[in-house]
Amino acid sequence: MADPWQECMDYAVILARQAGEMIREALKNKMDVMIKSSPADLVTVTDQKVEKMLMSSIKEKYPYHSFIGEESVASGEKTVFTEQPTWIIDPIDGTTNFVHRFPFVAVSIGFVVNKEMEFGVVYSCVEDKMYTGRKGKGAFCNGQKLRVSQQEDITKSLLVTELGSSRKPETLRIVLSNMERLCSIPIHGIRSVGTAAVNMCLVATGGADAYYEMGIHCWDMAGAGIIVIEAGGVLLDVTGGPFDLMSRRIIAASNIALAERIAKELEIIPLQRDDES
């Protein structure tokens, strides 16, 4: 039987490239920067333009599909997550990087049916790296097959995470104490590139052994989540329970043993779910 979603995925790759071109062009020009939920949560006109282009292109081709987009939600739309084929879009993952011209900026497109991730496309456009993952078909970067590391020993692991955009003292305390706890196990190190999607793709490549974060959103995870799984990795909730795309938290790891070991160390940040906002 023909893959019903392959055409959608091929289209997502074309659109991600177009969006990347818009972003690269915008990097040459002066930017108007606005603030969203905190002084460290930024948005630009380019975020909004790219999302508009992606949404209108997809809606024209697939009018009966559903959509969740970061900038649409920021402008007041509800996150409605149903069984319908749903495109989950982050037009610029790494807006702060974009504003500072720090070279990790990604377009993330996830596609979910019956609440299951079917495919993901993450285009790291400054690096010109196109990451793709299709349920049951593997994960690739620029056509090269991806495979997670086989590292199960946390003391030999390299982790990726972020400080996040919240500047609330209690949230920062938890974020930093979690890092301190993990570092003192000890582990080899912690890295951050400033975009959840690229952090997760680095786990898929085997370059990092695991990624964890709390406070991100479904549009940060939907594209890269399936890429990690298809590269042989696992997704887990930070409690060690099953991963939930609407929960705003994740451990993406090369294997279950490492994911569960990380979960043991984490103090949980209380968060409002995406589907409750």
Curated annotation (Swiss-Prot):
Its cofactor is Mg(2+). Keywords: Cytoplasm, Hydrolase, Lithium, Magnesium, Metal-binding. GO terms for biological process: inositol biosynthetic process; inositol metabolic process; phosphate-containing compound metabolic process; phosphatidylinositol biosynthetic process; phosphatidylinositol phosphate biosynthetic process; signal transduction. GO terms for cellular component: axon; cytoplasm; neuronal cell body. It is found in: Cytoplasm. GO terms for molecular function: fructose-1-phosphatase activity; glucose-1-phosphatase activity; glucose-6-phosphatase activity; glycerol-2-phosphatase activity; identical protein binding; inositol monophosphate 1-phosphatase activity; inositol monophosphate 3-phosphatase activity; inositol monophosphate 4-phosphatase activity. Its EC number is 3.1.3.25, 3.1.3.94. It catalyses: a myo-inositol phosphate + H2O = myo-inositol + phosphate; 1D-myo-inositol 1-phosphate + H2O = myo-inositol + phosphate; 1D-myo-inositol 2-phosphate + H2O = myo-inositol + phosphate; 1D-myo-inositol 3-phosphate + H2O = myo-inositol + phosphate. Transmembrane segments: none annotated. Mg(2+) 2 binds at residues 90, 93, 220. Activity with myo-inositol monophosphate and D-galactose 1-phosphate is inhibited by Li(+), Ca(2+) and Mn(2+), but also by Mg(2+) at concentrations above 3 mM. It comes from the Eukaryota. Pathway: Polyol metabolism; myo-inositol biosynthesis; myo-inositol from D-glucose 6-phosphate: step 2/2. SUPFAM superfamilies: Carbohydrate phosphatase. Substrate binds at residues 70, 92-95, 194-196, 213, 220. Pfam families: Inositol_P (PF00459). Ubiquitous. Mg(2+) 1 binds at residues 70, 90, 92. Belongs to the inositol monophosphatase superfamily. Phosphatase involved in the dephosphorylation of myo-inositol monophosphate to generate myo-inositol. Is also able to dephosphorylate scyllo-inositol-phosphate, myo-inositol 1,4-diphosphate, scyllo-inositol-1,3-diphosphate and scyllo-inositol-1,4-diphosphate. Also dephosphorylates in vitro other sugar-phosphates including D-galactose-1-phosphate, glucose-1-phosphate, glucose-6-phosphate, fructose-1-phosphate, beta-glycerophosphate and 2'-AMP. Homodimer. This is Inositol monophosphatase 1. It comes from Rattus norvegicus (Rat).
